[in-house]
Amino acid sequence: MGQYVSIAASDGSGRFDAYLALPASGKGPGVVIGQEIFGVNANMRAVADLYAEEGYVALVPDLFWRLQPGVDLGYDEAAFAKAIELFQRIDLDAAVDDIAACIEHLRQREEVVHAGIGFVGFCMGGKLAYLAATRTDVSCSVGYYGMDIEALLDEAKQIKGRLVLHFAEQDAYCPQQARDAILPCLRNLPKTELYLYPGVDHAFARVGGMHFDRPAYLMAHERSIAALKREIGPNFDLSALWDEHVRHEFDTRDVAATMATMVAEPYVNHVPTLTGGVGQRELSRFYRHHFIHGNPPDMTLTPISRTVGALQVVDEFVMRFTHSCEIDWLLPGVPPTGRFVEIPMLGVVRFRGDRLYHEHIYWDQAGVLVQIGLLEPQGLPVAGVESARKLLDESLPSNRLMARWAASEGLGL
């Protein structure tokens, strides 16, 4: 939970409130969050809390304070009408000055560990993200579905830091005509990133909103955090953090230590069997009773490749074991067969800050069933242990399952 702080306006006209959220470590780079037209409501506070979980000192200023302090609106018809009325009356120049005051406020806070400050804005805040990039010394400014930016392109030459803009293809507030003006003007500027999300509408990143689109939201969030990390951090050794998590899963087999590497509400999904859990309680139960103490004693993981991004680790590996016990998460309900199994696997592991947020683990379940004798491969386009062997030895023949492969021998290329 965050707290409210009071900030002095740079023009001496008064003070305004801002919601402040701190990371678990108590310190981190500073980020100003630009509100939607609905004020510093529960959604914007949740955004600040999310950025705090990512490792930032996040500050959401009340940018309507000169009109009506403490605006906190929902999303019904009356609230929307009120929000539009406030947006039409706000002095955006003064709002940018307030953002500059917030940037300076963060720099002066002992919790902020980097002189560079970021800005992330949504809707009205998305427009202000562009203005913050052109009029302040913000190190990285990220705007989601800002409107009317096309009318401000003469300021583009003043951009000094990194600018990231997320556009929604179906956004009536920033339609194709507007984007046709914005994109050619900005795309070739240094440290400028422009992203278009097909098939989504304005406010696609508002969790729980009528236009919320989870895939677009996740992709945009990853790009936003990556841009912030490039300019102001924080930078964590995600590879080492993932290794520590796996060590507790398979070596120390310590449930508490495993859970300690994860966020407060983690999510694990073994995709072929839909096993895992959501949240501390369910996932702790899963790890304790169905995973950590339920794996064969000879289970090993052989790493093949690892890709480390801004927020996630993608691991390619081969798992080997003797099917000497029932493995609830991998072969639920299947008695031990005593067969030795080799499985090519892929893990997509996402982090928030220095804690693991989710795991998506993929493998070919048909290949596993072939190896333990529960699926006859004859006449089916499936492979058994050959899949793992081919992953480790590229010289093994390809296309053995393609009946028509021989027919193309000698044909033109």
Where are these regions (language model features)?
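N-terminal cap/leader regions of alpha/beta-hydrolase-fold enzymes
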Residues: 1-258, 266-267, 272
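C-terminal and inter-domain tail/linker signature
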Residues: 169, 205, 209-413
